[in-house]
Structures are given as structure tokens and as C-alpha cells.
Amino acid sequence: RYNPERFLIHDFTTGPVSLDRTFDVCWCVEFVEHVYAEYILNFAVAWQQCKNLAMTHATPGQGGYHHVNEQPKEYWIDVLDQYGFDYSESMTEELKLRTTMNTHKKPKKAFVRNNGLYFKNRNL
């Protein structure tokens, strides 16, 4: 059940969300490929409140319902660098190695193992 003290619902096409605290980690799976590039600022500002960021992304040609922003990992590394995030190759590999998310499903559905990325916020 929805508890407003634990969850925040926000439409990032309307602008950034205001957060009044920091977080240890942001876990973002199956999101960025569904958001037009013009709205990246709106969610990146929220992510700046997180010390660590683990995310997935869809690659060009991967396909999927409402995939409007399929990009290679280098794109996300460059974009997130502009918002203060340093890509960690070692933590990305650790994330992919240890994930159990969807590993029992078809290989294409193993989102973290296939296209997981890990970043550290250099400003927190």
C-alpha cells in the first residue's frame, strides 16, 4: 500500500522533484529508456541527492514498449558526469556479478546483468 512517508510519486516531465535529504543509493531499473532526453535534467537533479547510483539502460536497437531513449553506456557515462557522477567499472562488474534480478528469466530480461551501470557521486 502507498505510504507517502516512504514513497514519492512524481512525473519528471513536469520538472525536477524537490528532495530535502540525501540518500545512500539510488536504484533505477527500467526507467531511463522510457524518458525523452529533454527530461534528463529533471531526474538527474534528484539523483544528485544520492551518494551512489545503480541503474540500467536499454541499448540502441534493443526495442521495447515506449523505448524513446535507447543509448550506449558511454552516453550515460558522459551525461551523468555532467551531474557529478563518476562511473565505476569495478562496481559495475560487481553489480553484474552479484545480481539475482531476473536471472531466472529469458537472457534479454536480465536487465542488471546485461546493462547495469554503477556510479559514485563525487560531490557527496
Model-derived regions: residue spans:
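Conserved SAM-binding loop
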Residues: 1-66, 70-77, 120-121
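Short secondary-structure boundary/hinge segments and terminal tails
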Residues: 64-65, 97-99
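Amphipathic alpha-helical segments
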Residues: 80-81
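Core SAM-dependent methyltransferase catalytic element
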Residues: 99-124
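Conserved S-adenosyl-L-methionine
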Residues: 84-97
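General N-terminal targeting signals
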Residues: 70, 93, 102-104
